[in-house]
């Protein structure tokens, strides 16, 4: 199941031939598109400090 990147914060989003609104998002399961309550699948957040291990300058100068 995949979702469009329209979120429930938008008033309207196109879901196949249907318009989703009122806090719904478009869910696509391959055979049909339907408007469902809630948010779509979250996008990956931008890289943050937790994505990298800390190292000291001494580790670089080898």
Swiss-Prot record:
MF terms (GO), sorted A to Z: serine-type endopeptidase inhibitor activity
Disulfide bonds: 6-13, 15-26, 20-35
Subcellular location: Secreted
Signal peptide span: none
Record organism: Hirudinaria manillensis
Ranges where the record places region Disordered: 37-62
GO cellular component: extracellular region
Keywords for the protein's UniProt record, in alphabetical order: Disulfide bond, Glycoprotein, Protease inhibitor, Secreted, Serine protease inhibitor
Start and end residues of each stretch annotated as Interaction with fibrinogen-binding exosite of thrombin: 51-62
Glycan-carrying positions: 46
Site (Not glycosylated): 41
The keyword S-adenosyl-L-methionine is annotated on this UniProt entry: no
Modified how: O-linked glycan consists of Fuc-Gal-GalNAc trisaccharide.
Entry protein name: Hirullin-P18
Keyword match Disulfide bond: yes
Biased composition (Acidic residues): 51-62
Pfam family, one: Hirudin
Region of interest (Interaction with thrombin active site), ranges: 1-3
The protein's role, per its UniProt record: Inhibits thrombin, thereby abolishing its ability to cleave fibrinogen.
InterPro entries in alphabetical order: Hirudin, Hirudin/antistatin, Prot_inh_hirudin
Organism classification: Eukaryota, Metazoa, Spiralia, Lophotrochozoa, Annelida
Family: Belongs to the protease inhibitor I14 (hirudin) family.
SUPFAM superfamilies, per database record: Leech antihemostatic proteins
């Amino acid at each position: 199941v995949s979702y469009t990147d329209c979120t429930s914060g938008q008033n309207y989003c196109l879901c196949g031939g249907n318009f989703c609104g009122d806090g719904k998002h478009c869910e696509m399961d391959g055979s049909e598109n339907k408007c469902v309550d809630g948010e779509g699948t979250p996008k990956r957040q931008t890289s943050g400090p937790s994505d990298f291990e800390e190292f000291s300058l001494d580790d670089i100068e080898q």
